């Protein structure tokens, strides 16, 4: 098994990525208005998230409203809801397995079993990172495509919100942490091999 420091590094990276997933799930900052308008006094900034949208006035006051229906969301945000929630759950399971199989814990006595549990945790982190990366990239692609769509007015166009950048960082940390843990796959060096022993044949005249 690899060193305790490598395991701790991978675990810390994954936990930070997991917290980033929770942040992007909660914050309504996936999309933001691209154009404020000519009148700064009456300007409004619109934020769109997975669960609510918010309006920020020029005075700094912000009002948020939960979506009345899931069907009111665009396809990318509908998929992002499910994928981000699943990613948070999968990553949490990976954190639990990492703690259970860590070299500095005594939850599992067998060292080979510990190594397998840690590798399984790495797989969970990789899956969680991919599940988080898909909706973030999908939403970013949708924002960029609509931004350059000539049929949409300036008020309908959006820019990339802070949640998308946080999501990219969180996915990268999860993928890195998962890769570090998967590199700790146990080797088969200690496996015992059975050696067949054949007794030497005695010569015909040995007992004469």
Swiss-Prot record:
It is found in: Cell membrane; Cell junction, Tight junction. It comes from the Eukaryota. Keywords: Cell junction, Cell membrane, Membrane, Tight junction, Transmembrane, Transmembrane helix. InterPro entries: Claudin, Claudin_CS, PMP22/EMP/MP20/Claudin. GO terms for molecular function: identical protein binding; structural molecule activity. Gene3D superfamilies: 1.20.140.150. Component of tight junction (TJ) strands. This is Claudin-like protein ZF-A89. It comes from Danio rerio (Zebrafish).
